[in-house]
């Protein structure tokens, strides 16, 4: 009888501790990740020229160019910062994002795609319109699952 009680206590302890540990996990790594960079224009930038670049060059070339990533420049039309710009990078999952950009640096695989499709030149051209800070400051939002 005592042996059964000990086994029951051990199982109960494992259940409680396991449930507590699992309840602290807020994401599985499988939910989408939305990386947001709020783009701040450099001084004396022609906004219509920037928007033309965004539509005709950046967005059209980045459109599904990298598997698992949807990336584009957008403009706010409602809310607290109307007429502001942001770059959205929507990764299929946190796992995909971490594979592409481990430790805040592009992977060799991602660099190869960026070079083959000449996407780095577009990224560099984007930096002629927006401040360096707006390209390096971002938030990644992970879908809770």
What kind of feature is each model-predicted range?
Residues 1-8:
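Bacterial N-terminal signal peptides that target proteins for export
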Residues 16-28:
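Bacterial Sec-dependent signal peptides at the C-terminal "C-region" and cleavage site
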Residues 38-44, 89-93:
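Short beta-strand-to-loop capping motifs
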Residues 61-70, 90-137, 144-145:
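An amphipathic, aromatic/His-enriched active-site/gating alpha helix that lines ligand/cofactor pockets
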